[in-house]
Amino acid sequence: MKLPRIDFLVCSIFLVIAAPAWSGQAELALEEGLRLHEAGKPKEAIREYDKAIKADPKLAEAYFNRGNAYYDLGQNEQAVRDYSEVIRLSAKDAEAYFNRGNAYRRLKKDDLALKDFSAAIKLEPKDAKNYINRGSIHFGARRYEAALKDFGEALGLNPKDAETFYNRANSYLALDKKEDAIKDYGEALSLDPSLVDAYYNRGIAYADSAQYENAIRDFDEVLVRNPKSSNAFYNRALSKAKIDRYEAAVEDYSDAMRLNPKDPEAPFNRGRAYLRLGKFDHAARDFSEVIVTQPRNAEAFIYRGIARIYQGKDKEADADFQKAFQLNPAIKKNVQPIIDEAKAKAKASPTGKPLGRTPEQ
């Protein structure tokens, strides 16, 4: 069985801009820099922050806001330097640790980012965003239990945050705690019905729990909002096939292929649906398409061989089976009885009748 695809929502990145709190020339430059920055002109703002720093080299707010401007421009090394200067001048500035952590994340220095978010939590233990961003690092490192704990802390501080429910649900799903994941996706959707990825991943959780009708409904919701989601068509097709809705599954696999023609999994599974429908010519074509892109896919040779049995092409079928056994000798023991059964059924029944067993059963 091919694995479903899961989408993950990246945790929100928060930045904080400090308000000016100094007087004189430095204050004027800082105020002008802040005005320009808020007007979407970070380059011009940096020049004003430079003036403020020149007037007062110990003005932490100027370094902080210049760091934010560099961050907005994607100049993350410079942002780190400015946030580090803020921390040197004011070691208890939680927001400087937080923002430097975000810059480190962009630089793919997650270990340093983790330390900074932890420092921010120590200084501001009641600020949910610190836990959210640390949780996202844990999640990215597959430390799912730690991610659960951090997202839980964030929800304790802000129980109305839909994205945090979503991200905790993803952590539950990664730990195969599907019931908890489904519950959290539901909470996320009750707070923000526009979270299309929550419908999608809840659909995955439902499908993995053999709740295929619920899964189909969630994939329906995804496709209402994003009719070009090839993954939603693909996974909805998988669920439809599980409840013997093969014609409908074929339609969804076809839409998935139309939207993502280079994906070999949709034609593979559409071929299996065609087999169940007794459309052996169509099935053989799909498995042939898979073999073109995946010439070492033993399963595709097995399935095409079964289709060819029902087409009356025994010689070609046997060649497919031998190729499959050459690629993966271990599968012969399991599939040989199915091959023998298919040959017997093909002789006893007219071509075009639905199959009995197939290798996935």
Regions found by a protein language model. Give the residues of each.
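Terminal, low-structured helical/coil segments at or just beyond the last alpha-helical repeat
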Residues: 3, 26-28, 310, 315-361
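N-terminal leader/linker segments that initiate helical-solenoid repeat arrays
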Residues: 19-43, 47-48, 65, 343, ...
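Conserved alpha-helical positions within TPR/SEL1-like repeat arrays
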Residues: 30-38, 61-72, 95-106, 129-140, ...
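Short coil loop/turn residues that delineate tetratricopeptide repeat
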Residues: 58, 92, 126, 160, ...
